[in-house]
From Swiss-Prot:
This is CWF19-like protein 1 homolog. Belongs to the CWF19 family. GO terms for cellular component: post-mRNA release spliceosomal complex. It comes from Drosophila melanogaster. One of its GO terms (biological process) is mRNA splicing, via spliceosome.
Amino acid sequence: MHQVGSTNMMKIQSIAQLSITMDAGTKILVVGDVRGRFKQLFQRVEQVNKKAGPFEILCCVGDFFGEDKQNEELIAYKNGFKHITVPTYILGPNQREHEKYFENLTDGEICTNLTYLGRRGVYTLSSGVKIAYLSGLEAQGTADSAGSEHEFTKADVIAVRNSCLVSKNCSTEYRGVDVLLTSQWPFGMQEKENATASKLVSFLCREIKPRYHFCAINGTHYESAPFRMPKDETTQFELCTRFISLAEVGNAEKAKYIYALSLKPVDKSRLLDLAQKTTNEIPCPFIGLDLGGAIGKNDSSENRQYFYDMDGGRRKRQGGDNNKRDKRPRIPQIEQDKCWFCLSSPDVEKHLIITVGEHFYLALAKGPINKHHVMILSTKHVPCAAQLSPDDWKELNKFKAALRKFFKTLGQVVCFTERHYKSVHLQINALAFEEGYAWKIKHSFEDKAEEFNLEFETLPALDSEKMLPEMGPYFLAELPDDSTLITRQMKHFPIHFARDVFCSENLLNCDEKVNWKDCLLDKDEEVAYVEDFRKAFAPFDFTDD
């Protein structure tokens, strides 16, 4: 075991070197192609876990399943006769014949402690470690959508790239992700190019700048010297990547198929540590590659503007006229006196207002699901939380914290949602649920997302406006477990999606209240709701301080 660079990362080379003195960090195992050798894999993992664990997660790249006869080894684990000791997450199929093993899975679960990650996305561990993943092989041809479940396309790669950039921490500098998992090799990684290399994977690696990139399917173990991704619009730092290809489990050559590391999340690492150079670095293999056939110019650069802090006034671009202001898509404007939610508008229903702060006010929702259904709205004309100033954000968090404390006294937890799509004024819905229902909320969102064919990414607790896409539509839900669900898939997004979730059978079981227009109250009822809420909320109302 040896330390790599000056970062908190440890590499484990053999069972004799697996020490219980690994640096404090998130311990992760990664293995190459399993191909049905489940018994051999999980016995080996159990040994490693006892020697140098506990490990938080085991990630499998390449082919997890093998021939039908070989796959029978998994039956004992499905039936509970054998147990998987480390939570294991696998990538999807790389061949059509294996697609059947990934069908009809509930929440991706194959058996206890064995889960299919999905086609692509970003998985964030409880420690904050971010793992980007892309299943399958690059689809042949120019289609934007894959013809089968074992293929990925440009659209999938762009989606992963955007998910990584939108989930960046509050720092103005993008720091990369901790791990990238693909089955396919990136093009350009070796001088003698292999036939299965993908230019799309090269593009993805270059864009999201992982500290570690793991892949498989070539049947060989290969580790390159570390290399640095070129700086771009997302960061002025050249971030370091280590590429590792893992061999097949149980290979005759006894080539390395398992890799262990301990990571401190990039978002909690010092930029100086991430930028610290080592003595054995090589030039980035992706510089100078012609990726034009895989990614168009608009996809590779222009669309990126929606996901990072442009901040042109404080950070100079590479080349060009630094005095020119960044050009951003203009936000449709609407006169404040015609906005229903601006306090200065004659149309605002002031009898719904519970309390008013400097930047925000709290009001009863129009057509509420119940008498505790409230909204946090900006006093001024701001379209979404992503465009709030630091002072605005600070007060918004005070309102959220006050509501959490208030509902806790009632034995309830609260969920906050924001839908920014063709909206002109920031509205954040807050709805409380009995504490015993807290665990059901995320599952209910996932169920409805599947019903409407939506894909969400999971982020840590929302602690800065810079975690949100500065431009472009999105929907988010802040859950009681301090995680955040977010999607930018807003085309044909259901207008009542949040209410669909809240009113579902698993939660409030009141489908008749999905449409707010079906829940309109008489003005006298609204006034009574507001007065009752204001009185109960008074001990937590900081606006009078």
